[in-house]
């Protein structure tokens, strides 16, 4: 499922003394089956774009096209409902949205809300809970009895149970320890390998380098760079000026260049660095 934004602008609280422009004439494509990352400083417009992708917001001007279905300023909620089923949005700290009395019921709620039978919803819930690493002995537990990492997995399973074609992740590993972050990113990688389109908002440049195949860089509501991670992370000075930084490996390689060691193309992953050091 592909997504296209055409001349999209968004203004919060439009027509009031408190209005603020969040996005300015955004044009972008998210290709079917891609793993697209959005990076930018706080207030750059990343989260606003995420909420436009599944119709949580509608554009003030312009068109958001999801699988050839258009969302405009005039779109009604009932017209957007099918888009929300196909574009799953995982907020920061999604565990805050848990509410049912058991893990299984919480994950099954979403599919039932979209008209799936209780039996099929439970089957989907079991399947997705297993996929995110929640063991069956936890299914009848109250979600709030689980650890923070387990609660987040349950919340993500709830989104996956609605069988989205696109998964939008807004800082999905925020607050997790390195082990939990790695495990969660591995789950998303496997989903992408299975054919799902992944959209990631993150401030962790190593994750962008290791997982994404395309990157948009936002600043003050505008796209200032776009391209493959390898190309984007060659712009070390610009990214550091925007307080975004680069992958750790890239930063190390840049220091070597600054000391006179010739490196024609800065590596962005550990594997690439090994190749550079091996072959000179």
Swiss-Prot record:
GO terms for cellular component: ATP-binding cassette (ABC) transporter complex. This is Energy-coupling factor transporter ATP-binding protein EcfA2. Residues 3-245 form the ABC transporter domain. Forms a stable energy-coupling factor (ECF) transporter complex composed of 2 membrane-embedded substrate-binding proteins (S component), 2 ATP-binding proteins (A component) and 2 transmembrane proteins (T component). It is a peripheral membrane protein. It is found in: Cell membrane. Its EC number is 7.-.-.-. It comes from the Bacteria. InterPro entries: AAA+_ATPase, ABC_transporter-like_ATP-bd, ABC_transporter-like_CS, ABC_transpr_CbiO/EcfA_su, ECF_ABC_transporter_ATP-bd, EcfA2, P-loop_NTPase. One of its GO terms (molecular function) is ATP binding.
């Amino acid at each position: 499922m592909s997504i296209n934004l055409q001349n999209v602008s968004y203004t919060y609280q439009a027509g009031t003394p408190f209005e603020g422009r969040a996005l300015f004439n955004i044009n972008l494509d998210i290709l079917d089956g891609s793993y697209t990352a959005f990076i930018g400083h706080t207030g750059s417009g990343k989260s606003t774009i995420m909420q436009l992708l599944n119709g949580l917001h509608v554009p003030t001007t312009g068109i958001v096209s999801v699988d050839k279905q258009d969302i405009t300023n005039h779109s009604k909620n009932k017209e957007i409902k099918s888009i929300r089923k196909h574009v799953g949005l995982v907020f920061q700290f999604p565990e805050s949205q848990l509410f049912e009395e058991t893990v299984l019921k919480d994950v099954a709620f979403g599919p039932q809300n979209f008209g799936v039978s209780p039996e099929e919803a439970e089957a989907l819930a079991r399947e997705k809970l297993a996929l995110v690493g929640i063991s069956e002995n936890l299914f009848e537990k109250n979600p709030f009895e689980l650890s923070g990492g387990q609660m987040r997995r349950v919340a993500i399973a709830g989104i996956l149970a609605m069988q989205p074609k696109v998964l939008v992740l807004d800082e999905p590993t925020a607050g997790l320890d390195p082990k939990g972050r790695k495990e969660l990113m591995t789950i998303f990688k496997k989903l992408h390998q299975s054919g799902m389109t992944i959209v990631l908002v993150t401030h962790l440049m190593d994750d962008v380098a290791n997982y994404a195949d395309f990157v948009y860089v936002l600043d003050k509501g505008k796209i200032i760079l776009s391209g493959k991670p390898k190309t984007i992370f060659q712009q070390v000075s610009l990214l550091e000026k925007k307080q975004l930084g680069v992958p750790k490996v890239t930063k190390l390689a840049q220091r070597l260049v600054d000391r006179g060691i010739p490196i024609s193309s800065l590596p962005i992953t550990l594997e690439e660095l090994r190749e550079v050091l091996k072959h000179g």
